[in-house]
Structures are given as C-alpha cells and as structure tokens.
Amino acid sequence: MNTAAPSRKKLLSLVLTLVFMLTCLPAALAVDLNVDAGFYFKQSRGGTCTLASAAMMLRRRAYFDGLTDWSTVTENSVRSTAWSNGLSHSFTYKEMQVGYATLPSGLQSKTAVLISLLEQHPEGIVFYDRTQPHAVLLTDYTNGIFYCSDPAGNIGYG
C-alpha cells in the first residue's frame, strides 16, 4: 500500500494554501488612502486652507512612504517650511518635495491633467481656486467623479 501519495497531496495542498494566503496578504493589510485613517483634519484658523490641505497631502505621502511618524505631520509642523503669508509655491518638508503648477484652460484639458497628476501622486493634490479663494485636497478620481477633503471648518464632509 502506497501512503506517500496522500501525504504529498496534503503537503501540496497546504503549500498552495499558504502561497495563496501570502499573495492576498498585502491587499488585506492595505489601507485605502481614501478612507479616513487619521489623514484628514480641519484648518486651525481662517485663511489657512492651503496650508491645511498641504499638510494633509504630506501626511498621506508620509504614510504611503511607510514613515511611522506620519500622524505628526500637522498644519503647525508644516508651517515653518511652507508658509509665508500664504502657501509657498515650492518647499521641502521631511525630504518630501512639493511643487506648483497651473492647469491648462478648458475643462477636458484640466480633467486630463488632474487625472494624470493623481495617478502620479496618490497622496493627492492641493487644488486652489483663485476665483473662490479656497483650497481642498483632491484625493481621487473614480468613475468620473473627483473626490476631495475640504479643510474648511464649515464643511462637514468632503
């Protein structure tokens, strides 16, 4: 009687199960950056929506990069390197570089550029509207909808 075959089948089954579990593990442990895991907050005072949005973006980038102190990225911690009577157009905070760009004219062109930027920068984009002087953190584009976090104190969700 051959008892080796059933043992090999059990061992192979166990190994395949472990391999399957290991391939699923990263997805199971991943945090969706669009779910609030402590990334988002409201601005500390009026007129700092750009600073608060930038701090949330940097907080998400720090988390994404695996920095354990990502939750210490706050409006106040970013202020000294990013703020001078308004958000600086370019600055570096904890080795994370932030730049400035202007969107092209035309809705389709703007949409295409924003989608491309979000693909390159999953931490998000600080989006400032000069006509409404206000900034939000643009975080995602899914199924034709842009998602954002609005730091304004009078906005409950968004």
Question: Which positions does each model-derived feature cover?
Answer:
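Short intrinsically disordered, low-complexity segments
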Residues: 7-9, 21, 32
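Glutamine-centric residue-chemistry signal
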Residues: 42-44
